[in-house]
């Protein structure tokens, strides 16, 4: 199945820029708490890792659903998970579990991914009749 977004057309979710950015987030998120003060905070470490993987999974699951409405809903979840990663890594930096510099490397990736996801959502809102427009909420 091919999905067209403006001038871009995707046949696989791996071609979506937001998914590629999310992959970079996962790699960084897993490396954040390998060592150092936060390595033993299993709950925070697990939540950061699960939220980062959730971004990738929601994008791919939505794409593979073959429904524009489901894709939109999964993109919304992915965007939320992206914000969760950003918040959790901010907390980890504030409580001294990771150096602030590591958070500052991950933060722009989260913002970029969130913007990429929003662009896909906006396109769906404006071009697909079965996707709710924010104007109708």
Regions found by a protein language model. Name each.
Residues 1-137:
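Short, C-terminally biased terminal segments at protein or domain edges
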């Amino acid at each position: 199945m091919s999905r067209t977004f403006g001038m871009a057309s995707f046949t696989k979710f791996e071609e979506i820029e937001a998914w590629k950015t999310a992959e970079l987030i996962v790699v960084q998120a897993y490396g954040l708490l390998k060592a150092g003060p936060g390595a033993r905070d299993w709950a925070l470490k697990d939540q950061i890792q699960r939220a980062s993987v959730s971004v990738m999974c929601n994008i791919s699951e939505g794409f593979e659903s073959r429904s524009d409405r489901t894709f939109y809903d999964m993109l919304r979840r992915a965007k939320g998970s992206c914000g969760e990663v950003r918040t959790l890594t901010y907390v980890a930096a504030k409580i001294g579990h990771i150096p602030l510099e590591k958070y500052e490397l991950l933060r722009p990736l989260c913002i970029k991914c969130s913007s990429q996801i929003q662009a896909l959502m906006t396109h769906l809102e404006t071009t697909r009749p079965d996707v709710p427009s924010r104007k109708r909420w």
